[in-house]
Amino acid sequence: SVNELYEFLESSRLPITDDGYFLAYKKVTEDFKDKHTRSMDNSVGSTVSMPRRKVNDNRDQTCSTGLHFAAYNYANSFGSGKLVVLKINPKDVVSIPSDYNNEKGRCCEYIVHSHVESEDTLTGKGFVSSY
């Protein structure tokens, strides 16, 4: 998954934080729950996790189990709801699916870093103006 993550970060042009994490995006419900089960709290400051062994590591199974994250364009096109910025430790990345132009991934843990209130809070190609 190391090479897959490098491809994801390179193609998505997402920032790496001073402490070695990277930032990515996720679309959640209006009340900050995950869109799949509506049971995981994705409000700012929350840490969301699941056992790593339950995250599908097969990149050719593109829609599968795991905590999903994405590049800005992919996440923002994922229907209605709130767009949140995730802070992810690279060690928690399990797979980058092969057929989405390296724009989405699966991990076992992330921290909800912030909420994107409008595109005005973004600069560049998906970079967050403050992190």
Sequence positions of predicted segments:
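ADP-ribosyltransferase catalytic core
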Residues: P51-T121
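C-terminal catalytic or substrate-handling cores of phosphate/nucleotide-
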Residues: V128-Y131
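ADP-ribose/NAD+-binding catalytic cleft of ART/PARP-like enzymes
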Residues: S1-T62
